Amino acid sequence: MICENVETFAEALPRTGAVAGLDLGTKTIGVAVSDGLRGVASPLTVIRRTKFTADAQALLKIVQDRALVGLVLGLPRNMDGSEGPRAQSTRAFARNLERLTPLPITFWDERLSTVAAERALLEGDTSRKRRAEVIDQVAAGYILQGALDRLRFLGRTE
């Protein structure tokens, strides 16, 4: 089920259970997961993209292995807030994934998440080679943490 906003996503989620954040690129999918109470996002892995069925199979294996209850996809908006071809591609991925899983799926604005991830890795004195290996999963962590913070805020205002 695709939830167009985090408020609807929050209503569709069970009270506890981990969720995943995804940073969809053309060559890779960065994956991060939360703890069961949805307080902290942790980078998990990178899926090398081939074709949708293989990508979805790898992702759904993570969903099953970790008993995830929802998915947050980074939505690459333009700096003016509009949606371009990359955002349309992300929405198409979500529609295709929706056919394969009953989990709620939502989007989170990913503007500057890769920049923030790169900055954090540089500050951590991570080598260029290592940065290239982990940047997508760290960016997924930033995307997921933003959504988790919003979910926590919504929980306080109910």
Curated annotation (Swiss-Prot):
Function per UniProt: Could be a nuclease involved in processing of the 5'-end of pre-16S rRNA.
MF terms in GO: nuclease activity
Protein name (Swiss-Prot/TrEMBL): Putative pre-16S rRNA nuclease
Primary enzyme class: hydrolase
Keywords: Cytoplasm, Hydrolase, Nuclease, Ribosome biogenesis
UniProt xrefs under SMART domains: YqgFc
InterPro entries: RNaseH-like_sf, YqgF, YqgF/RNaseH-like_dom, YqgF/RNaseH-like_dom_sf
Family: Belongs to the YqgF nuclease family.
GO biological process terms, semicolon-separated: rRNA 5'-end processing
EC number: 3.1.-.-
Pfam families, alphabetized: RuvX
Source species, domain of life: Bacteria
GO cellular component: cytosol
